[in-house]
Amino acid sequence: MKTTKRISINLLKSFVGASLAFCVSSGASAVGIEDIVDGGNNFAWERVEIPGTKCSDGSQYKFWVHDNPGSRNLLVMYEGGGACWDYETCSGAAGLLGAANPNGLPDDYITQQKAQYVSPLVNGADPGFPLRPKTDIATKDWDVAYMPYCTGDVHVGNNITTYNDPAGISPPINFHHMGYNNSIAALDFLNNKFKRINKFLITGFSAGGVASGALYHEAHERLGIKRGKGYMLNDSGPLFPAADASANSRQLHETISIAWDMNSVLTNLPDSFNPDDMGSVTDMLADEYPNDHFAYTGYSTDLNFSRFSYERFYPGIDTAGILALWQEDQQLLISKMNNYDNFSYIIPWNRPINDSHCSTILTFLGSHACPSVRKKYWYEALEWPQTQSWKCPGAFTSMTNFLSSWIGGNTLRLEEPYNLYNQEDPGMQIIGPQINSAL
């Protein structure tokens, strides 16, 4: 396998963070995601190719637009898929800690399983399962722009560079971190296409979640969004506060800043953004757009984005150590969001799908939150299901209801404590392994 083609079997699992690639195994017992969820869409997609936009290998960047004539609401979805910043991560030598689509985007990408099934937000419905019907959600019938990910730079890099094999064995890799250029060109296209936008939602998962916050200012200004009509939902792509060298995420931020030439991009943000602390994007958004609506979702035990954040920078760190740093950083983010009336969040503890990474992908099953969840008391042990030792004394807030209320203009703040509710849930025990086996 030639390094210059930059194909890695491990990188196939980099689609969401580092482990969401839809694939069907060979053999009679093969199961694909389409066999498990009643999802997907049949949109009449328009493929858009803008001259000068490129994937990491220099091939043409492409994105897709669904224009519903009856809608004035626009959703822009930034796809996830890991990240890379050196030879090991950009070549695939680092295994799962790499970036998606290193060989560009085929013309039928939008109809392939991963793009078609990945997002209930795009499809406008939480997909059903056997005995569980499909449920329409707040983004049903919206116009959609789907931004695939193929630049390894969370859609905001601005650097063409060469990565050399430190062992001197394999040939160098020429890598186009051109996410920012691609994103700006796409936003300008959308501005020309959609002239009368009512509500505007920019969102993304994993690497795309980072992009949703980092690009909100550019999107808002270029598309001329009315104040109070803008929404940003970051799914599992947090920019944690990292103001000094002691911060847990500081090494990651410094590394990508150099590799992707972030200084050339960050200068375009308002003065309320502190370029020495990427986590200040939370303050910038809240201050610059006090009437708009922002939200974060992610799991407290995410073992995907957390690995990208710490594993390469803390040699020898184990799973417990990774999650400890993640939860420390998450509390810093929560404290920062609590300072602003226009920031919401829904943070469940765990979901045994995709290493608890991403709340809004594939299905909303298990993405609910109950801040008062606890162990059952002894006298509740016989409550159904008897195999479930955890209980929500009130009611779970589902992702569907969270989105409906938040897009309706309300602020919601939900953080679950430690619990194993999802692990013991009978439905999750059936569906979770099936989904994971199809990833």
Regions found by a protein language model. Give the residues of each.
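Cleavable N-terminal signal peptides
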Residues: 17-18, 28
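C-terminal His-loop and adjacent cap/lid subdomain of alpha/beta-hydrolase
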Residues: 31-439
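Bacterial N-terminal signal peptides that target proteins for export
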Residues: 3-16
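N-terminal signal peptide c-region/cleavage motif recognized by signal peptidases
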Residues: 23-26
